[in-house]
Regions:
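Positively charged n-region of N-terminal signal peptides that target proteins for export
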Residues: 1-4
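Bacterial N-terminal signal peptides
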Residues: 7-17
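A domain-start/cap signature at the N-terminus of enzymes
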Residues: 18-59, 104, 128-157, 163, ...
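Short substrate-entry loop that stabilizes the transition state in hydrolases
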Residues: 53-100, 165-166, 196
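Loop/turn elements at helix/coil->beta-strand transitions in domains of secreted/extracellular proteins
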Residues: 55-59, 84-89, 126-129, 150-156, ...
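Cell-envelope and extracellular/periplasmic
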Residues: 64-66, 135, 142, 146-147, ...
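Alpha/beta-hydrolase active-site loop
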Residues: 100-124
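The feature captures the conserved acid-bearing segment of alpha/beta-hydrolase catalytic domains
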Residues: 155-214
Length: 214
């Protein structure tokens, strides 16, 4: 059943269109940032829940970078998510761009989930599985969430993104230690003219080194 659910999620992402969009977000709360030096202390978390949803089964979570909002507000995307009882949370500005879990990233996310659960009345938001999505400079944060909280992470989506184990001083710091994201489904997208011809080699290398990565 989990695999069927995830197939629906990934199928939705690969087929979304930017032609028709809808910008309804029913609830929002200010974000209490637990970082020692938050870059965006004025961040706000916005929540969308399908109109006929009685109980949220999962949450698609995004921090604002560039393309995330276009994906989240796409009408066809939301129709498919509604069929799956998947909610959306969009945080703008981002609360912790790379999800540095050594600097309060999880505590911040956990807090806003609890606040939105209280505000909306959908109590399950505080415990529901999370599908993290990030684009470009924020493309690695889903993997960092998965590494820190694998028990809460249903899947990771990296748009124009990175491979999970790629490291960079600024965007993908080496803070995982012995953590891994084995058995957590991940989807990385890269355009044909967007370094795909070389970046695919890195993906093949990581799959070989981490055979339990779906």
């Amino acid at each position: 059943m989990k695999h069927v659910f995830l197939f629906g999620i990934f199928g939705w992402l690969l087929s979304f269109t930017l032609v028709a969009q809808t910008g309804i977000w029913q609830w929002s709360v200010p974000v209490h940032n637990f970082s020692t030096h938050p870059k965006n202390p004025e961040s706000r978390a916005y929540l969308w829940i399908p109109g006929q949803c009685e109980q949220v089964k999962a949450i698609l979570v995004a921090q604002h970078n560039m393309e995330e909002i276009s994906i989240l507000e796409d009408e066809a995307s939301r129709q498919r998510l509604a069929e799956l009882d998947v909610a959306q949370i969009w945080v703008c500005p981002s609360f912790n761009h790379g999800f540095d879990f050594t600097d309060g990233a999880w505590e911040t996310l956990d807090g806003l989930l609890a606040d939105l659960a209280e505000e909306s009345g959908y109590k399950e938001l505080s415990t529901a599985p999370l599908i993290a999505i990030g684009h470009s400079a924020a493309a690695s944060w889903p993997y960092y969430l998965a590494a820190y909280k694998p028990e809460r992470t249903l899947a990771c989506i990296s748009v124009s993104g990175q491979w999970p184990y790629h490291r960079d001083r600024w965007l993908c710091p080496d803070i995982w230690g012995e953590r891994n994201i084995n058995k957590i489904p991940c989807l990385e997208t890269m355009g044909e003219y967007e370094s795909a011809h070389t970046w695919s080699n890195e993906g093949l290398k990581e799959r070989k080194e981490h055979p339990l990565l779906p």
